[in-house]
Amino acid sequence: FPTRRSSDLKVTGYRRSLSLDEAVSSVSFNSGGVNYKREYFATNPDNVLVLRLTADKQKSITMNMGLDLMRQADLSVEDNQLVFTGKVDFPLHGPGGVCFEGRIAVLADNGEVKMEQSGVGIKEADAVTLIVDVRTDYKSPDYKTLCADGVKKAAAKSYDE
């Protein structure tokens, strides 16, 4: 989806906050006459990260997102989730390393989501929720199933749950 570059947008009223009671970090700002809010938290027992972007005007969220990973990873789309898999080697410490898998579910309130291997496009959404889970084989050889199940279970809940 075509979007404006973030460098072209003027941002005012930028504010960061942290609620220790609710364990939620948030950022709010105004751009183009629209008030936006981003909220972030890690949930237990779901063991996922949740990021939510909302706007005070309908159909105000249009954007493209991609991954810029520090490690070599294979990217794919599976079950409407962006999936990245790979292995991290530690050559200084001998052979071995850990295999990893990460999944990102993108849930848009209204609007359209276009998911491709290169990233995700969101068009005219009222709100967007990202659910992120990353697992390694360090503790469990079944890390891929745990990762997929974690995102799937969390995505089945409403944001308020």
Segments the model singles out, each with a brief description of its role:
Residues R4-E161:
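Aromatic-residue-lined binding/catalytic grooves and analogous aromatic/hydrophobic interfacial grooves
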